[in-house]
């Protein structure tokens, strides 16, 4: 029996959402029980023996991964959401998109000063959303001790961007090209 890698579970959709884009669809990974379990195991592997107070996930697929990782670690989960999606008091950070600006938010009491946080998402492209998430966590006094992704798109520079912030970046696989 041959064993599939995480990359083998990810489908590529050509020309989505725009012509010339190769969309890396991780929903096929999530749909396969074995593939999903392998992904969670591998996301956690570099952090064996480390203690986290919280896991933060970026909207939306980071919620799926982050929830599973938090469950495995027996810790709390913090959703980092698009503006206007969280009830109650929040703090926000804006970041640049290719055409315009976006804003992410977190509850202002989601992370306590000094808590160690693992940031999780499905895909690292330019790193803008992850950087905004890191800034939110740090504004609350949390310490991001790792950033874990299923897919890295190295040609878009996200890893370099996060590493320039002093972040440890872990990705299960990389896809070259756009």
Curated annotation (Swiss-Prot):
GO terms for cellular component: cytoplasm. Its EC number is 2.4.2.7. PROSITE patterns: PUR_PYR_PR_TRANSFER. Disulfide bonds: none annotated. Keywords: Cytoplasm, Glycosyltransferase, Purine salvage, Transferase. It comes from the Bacteria. Pathway: Purine metabolism; AMP biosynthesis via salvage pathway; AMP from adenine: step 1/1. GO terms for molecular function: adenine binding; adenine phosphoribosyltransferase activity; AMP binding. It holds the Pfam family Pribosyltran. Homodimer. Belongs to the purine/pyrimidine phosphoribosyltransferase family. PANTHER family: ADENINE PHOSPHORIBOSYLTRANSFERASE (PTHR32315:SF3). Catalyzes a salvage reaction resulting in the formation of AMP, that is energically less costly than de novo synthesis. HAMAP family: Aden_phosphoribosyltr. This is Adenine phosphoribosyltransferase. It comes from Cereibacter sphaeroides (strain ATCC 17023 / DSM 158 / JCM 6121 / CCUG 31486 / LMG 2827 / NBRC 12203 / NCIMB 8253 / ATH 2.4.1.).
């Amino acid at each position: 029996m041959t064993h599939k890698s995480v990359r083998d579970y990810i489908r590529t959709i050509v020309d989505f959402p725009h012509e010339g884009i190769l969309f890396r669809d991780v929903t096929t990974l999530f749909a396969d029980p074995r593939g999903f379990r392998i992904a969670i195991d591998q996301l956690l592997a570099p952090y064996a023996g480390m203690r986290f107070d919280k896991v933060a996930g970026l909207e939306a697929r980071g919620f799926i991964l982050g929830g599973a990782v938090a469950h495995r670690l027996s810790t709390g989960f913090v959703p980092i959401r698009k503006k206007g999606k969280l009830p109650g008091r929040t703090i926000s950070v804006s970041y640049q998109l290719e055409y315009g600006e976006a804003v992410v938010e977190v509850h202002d009491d989601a992370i306590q000063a000094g808590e160690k946080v693992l940031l999780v998402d499905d895909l690292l492209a330019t790193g803008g959303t992850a950087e905004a998430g890191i800034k939110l966590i740090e504004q609350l006094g949390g310490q991001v001790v790792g950033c874990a992704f299923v897919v890295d798109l190295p040609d878009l520079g996200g890893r370099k961007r996060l590493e320039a912030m002093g972040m440890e970046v872990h990705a299960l696989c990389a896809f070259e090209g756009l």
